[in-house]
Amino acid sequence: MADQLIKATAADGGIRAVGVISTRLTEEARARHKLSYVATAALGRAMTAGLLLASNMKREGSRVNLRIKGNGPLGGLLVDAGLDGTVRGYVDCPFVELPPNARGKLDVGGAIGREGYLYVVRDVGYGYPYSSTVELISGEVGDDVTHYLATSEQTPSALLLGVFVGAQGVTAAGGLLLQVMPKAARDEALVATLESRVSQLSGFTPLLRSGKTLPDMFEQLLGDLGLVILPEIQLLRFDCRCSFTRVLGALKMLGEAELQDMIEKDNGAEATCEFCSEVYQASSDHLAQLIDDLRTESVGS
């Protein structure tokens, strides 16, 4: 099944639902960064959460950044997700592995840490980005993003995130975001019903691995509440905006002396993108051209 995002409403528009399948893009992140099992689960959950949050933005080009910094051995992670369905991300310590937690699951909370912060930045492409910071609740990502939605956006929300990774890589990943909109937030019975149904689920990946599609999941949760599934299906992908041109631009900012030193000592330069682990090689000729450009610009000014 292709990585995708679909939306739905229920309760006469009082409930907003978004579903994401992110199996392939999570596997690509795992392969690119050579992630451990627990690091794969952590980054996969965070990338899915980023896509779910970005789906609520309106302006073309809008993006959401999620940064989690905890006191666990994983260190932290950063995700950049767009309204256009693209996402990228990395973890600080990709090779960290931990024993399963008490429930026999990957210990994402132990890897990230239970103490720390979640930083969310929403960039709509103009003006100053909107940023918010909340303390971590569990380090499991889903709890922490739900806490952010409740405190910073004041929207009652239920969030399910899941990644199943084994010896063959990632075989299931995705998530569901259910939100009670302001016009229905005072309906305590509706909120209680939604919370009860979500709490009875065993998680997202068991649903996906059992063969259920996103519409199936929506039907299970909201089918008797006037469910309306929107027809649009958005395809999702891991995509990084890095390029050799950007690398050369960054090297140019180092200045003539540093570039000359690289030519003499290293016969060039190597740069690795943190977001996608793509490696770029700049030859001594490339660096010499940058020096020429700097000198030309200096004379022109």
UniProtKB/Swiss-Prot annotation:
Record keywords: Chaperone, Cytoplasm, Disulfide bond, Redox-active center, Zinc
Biological process annotations from GO: protein refolding
Molecular function as annotated in GO: protein folding chaperone; unfolded protein binding
Protein family: Belongs to the HSP33 family.
Superkingdom of this protein's organism: Bacteria
Protein name (record): 33 kDa chaperonin
Matches recorded under Gene3D superfamilies: Hsp33 domain (3.55.30.10), HSP33 redox switch-like (3.90.1280.10)
Record's comment on post-translational modification: Under oxidizing conditions two disulfide bonds are formed involving the reactive cysteines. Under reducing conditions zinc is bound to the reactive cysteines and the protein is inactive.
Chief location bin: cytoplasm
SUPFAM superfamilies reported in the protein's UniProt record: Hsp33 domain, HSP33 redox switch-like
Entry annotated with the keyword Cytoplasm: yes
GO cellular component terms listed in the entry, alphabetical order: cytoplasm
Extent of the signal sequence: none
NCBIfam families xrefs: PRK00114.1 (NF001033)
Cystine residue pairs: C240-C242, C273-C276
Localization, UniProt: Cytoplasm
HAMAP family found in the cross-reference section: HslO
One Pfam family hit: HSP33
